[in-house]
Amino acid sequence: MEAIKPLPQVSSFSASVFSFLDGRFKESTDLSHSTGLVSELQTEISELDQRLAGLNRQLESGLAAYASFSDRVGGLFFEVNAKLADLSSSTSVTRSASDSGKEEEATEHVAGEDLPSLAKEVAQVESVRAYAETALKLDTLVGDIEDAVMSSLNKNLRTSRSSGFEEVRLHAIKTLKTTEEILSSVAKRHPRWARLVSAVDHRVDRALAMMRPQAIADYRALLSSLRWPPQLSTLTSASLDSKSENVQNPLFNMEGSLKSQYCGSFHALCSLQGLQLQRKSRQLGIHKGENVLFHQPLWAIEELVNPLTVASQRHFTKWSEKPEFIFALVYKITRDYVDSMDELLQPLVDEAKLAGYSCREEWVSAMVSSLSLYLVKEIFPIYVGQLDEANETDLRSEAKVSWLHLIDLMISFDKRVQSLVSQSGILSLQEDGNLLRISSLSVFCDRPDWLDLWAEIELDERLVKFKEEIDNDRNWTAKVQDELISSSNVYRPPIISSIFLQHLSSIIERSKSVPALYLRARFLRLAASPTIHKFLDCLLLRCQDADGLTALTENNDLIKVSNSINAGHYIESVLEEWSEDVFFLEMGTGQHDPQEVPGLENFTEPSEGIFGEEFEKLEKFRLEWINKLSVVILRGFDARIREYIKNRKQWQEKKDKEWTVSRALVGALDYLQGKTSIIEENLNKADFTAMWRTLASEIDKLFFNSILMANVKFTNDGVERLKVDMEVLYGVFRTWCVRPEGFFPKLSEGLTLLKMEEKQVKDGLSRGDKWLRENRIRYLSEAEAKKVAKSRVFS
């Protein structure tokens, strides 16, 4: 029987043994647990022995690999030394005086040929040496990482020596960073070593796959010990809008070792995430500053938000018909704890060198994401179902109101949480990527069909309200009087155009809340563009009604058309002004949905702008009806001047002493002046100018073709009569210009020819087109000038 070993001397115990025994045997009753302690220690010793054996095998393998590399490198060095010796002997042979020059040249030629190949072999040896050293160094580092990971997973180490466990994990993270630095250097300097990098990446990925879940599990355990999340049961609907003065924040209440453990765990998670981002940047070949393409939420912040989300959803289920309470609760939680993100956690993120991350921003983003996920899963399906199931008009109207109320809540919520982020001064809210992360409206990115539904509802509601304003005739007659809007005085639009712009501006303002550029443009094309088309249809219908009833012969119909043109031109000018705004210019860059959402054509060409098509249609409408007004007046003027034109004998009659203007022309000119004055009083100045200039051009053609080109004979008195009549005609247009005859070019130049002497005309026309230009006759062709000259009768 084996003798019982005596107990060791107490004086031989180390300080750590004393500390261990004191911790295990505080009282005499603890001696009963000694058997269990022995079993536990034996188990741990067995595990350590197994681990030691594994490390020995790994060491043997490493030494064997090193020996293999050493043998190979030694062999290469031996070959190089041998060739260097041969080279030395070939170049140091003593030449005798009798040696010929040919032998010397041959020896130097041989040595010169050997040098390049020798240099190449030396470079290969150096490359192999560098590869071997790098491979061994990486193998050692990865081995340290794997050891540290296995140690961190050891249950006994985790329970009995928490400080040692933290040190092991910290050492593993530092080693991972060192390994990543070497891999980055190798990837840049030695791209041919890709297989080495791939092999190391594979082993590191396995280590990280074990480290991250364990780090997250430890972090969750610490949060649980901190009693996170805080209690939400005390919340009531009355307290949702007010900020809690005595809010219980477990993060601020941490003390001592618990705070140290939490900060260490938070720092470890941030370091692991930063390391993963570096590895991903290297593997994708992305340079520093371009990692926004794969921005990841901060893991540690996500773990803070997840239990809060679970606790909040217990309240959400009670408020399914009161979504305003849901938004209020999420905002309250976000606001109450956002300060601790800056004060407590941001320094830890900075210490972990996790560039480009703001804890405040990540906290708000995570809370908004949790809300968006709940909206997608629980709220929106209910609202969509209500719209699909509502067959009756009243029920569908209620469903639309509920939908728009939900959108209003989302827009209001986004503005409030974005103000929380902007207070830090870090985030640029003008960037679509940032807006997507802190906007509840980002739900439409994955569900563009819901965006289309929203645009349809928005359009219907606006058109219903606008129709009531369209049917009010007073809105079409009263003018916009706003001294602050200079364009309103220029275009003299009716009130209906201002009302329309209010509805259109409201749609545009709501579109600004949509976080993605391509979705913003999609919404405007589905909601704003049809609104403009509807208004244009109303303008066109009013003009067509006036034209169809009286062919625009009544003054009221001319006023009606003039007001419609004013309204259209005013809207056209506003759209042109908007097209220069940055908000609309961005939509004209041709950017589209990266997922190429079907069902919507490319919304715009870069040169057109978002409302390019609508602008062109408004311009076409305006020009068409301006021309229509001039045609109507010309038609009436032509009907009243028929007798004057048919009287061909009047141009050969002798001059009367009291002769002023032809009586047959007076009535036509009175009609012309009366109708034009009516239009001047009601049409905006720019379009009226275009109208009377078009009218003058048509009257010029009418008189020229009907009188001067109609083979009429003119005596001296006839020429004088025509001159006087035309002066009266010019006088009608002198109200709007200084030199009206310039707008009757053919008539004026025809009179110039008629007033010339017979010899001057005959001699001049024989010189042809050159003579016409010298006499400033530019609008008449040579044939027309000759025909006018032939109509002159000289006495």
Curated annotation (Swiss-Prot):
Induction: By salt and osmotic stresses. The keyword tRNA processing does not apply. Keywords: Coiled coil, Endoplasmic reticulum, ER-Golgi transport, Membrane, Protein transport, Transport. Its main location: endoplasmic reticulum. InterPro entries: EXOC6PINT-1/Sec15/Tip20_C_dom2, RINT1_Tip20. Residues 100-111 have a biased composition (Basic and acidic residues). One of its GO terms (biological process) is protein targeting to vacuole. Changing residue 330 to M: In mag2-6; accumulation of precursors of storage proteins in dry seeds. Changing residue 265 to N: In mag2-5; accumulation of precursors of storage proteins in dry seeds. Highly expressed in dry seeds. Expressed at low levels in roots, rosette and cauline leaves, stems and flowers. Interacts with SEC20 and SYP81. Interacts with ZW10 (via the central region). Forms a complex with ZW10/MIP1, MIP2 and MIP3 on the endoplasmic reticulum. Belongs to the RINT1 family. This is RINT1-like protein MAG2. It comes from Arabidopsis thaliana.
